[in-house]
Amino acid sequence: MTVKVQISGTLKEYSRQSSEINISALNVGAALEALQSEYPSLYNCVCDETGRVRRHLNLFVNCDLVPIQNTNGFDTLLHSGDVLTIWQAVSGG
């Protein structure tokens, strides 16, 4: 099933300047695997060397936060037309 991945901010430079990517995936883990094969530089910005999502990023499916602190979040199901958003946390002083 096809889902839309929305890329925020500076991560666009790793997605060939696209703010949206269409991929085929059944769950969040499969979506990340698709990113790894199609956009390896983007994947490396999103996930660390162990495959976990980096701490300064959040993933949302249709505006619902994905619990990526544990690997169960990778099992979050995706349906055709869903939107997976990769959101980069911003902070300052």
Where are these regions (language model features)?
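Ubiquitin-like/PB1-type beta-grasp interaction modules and other compact soluble beta-rich domains
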Residues: 1-92
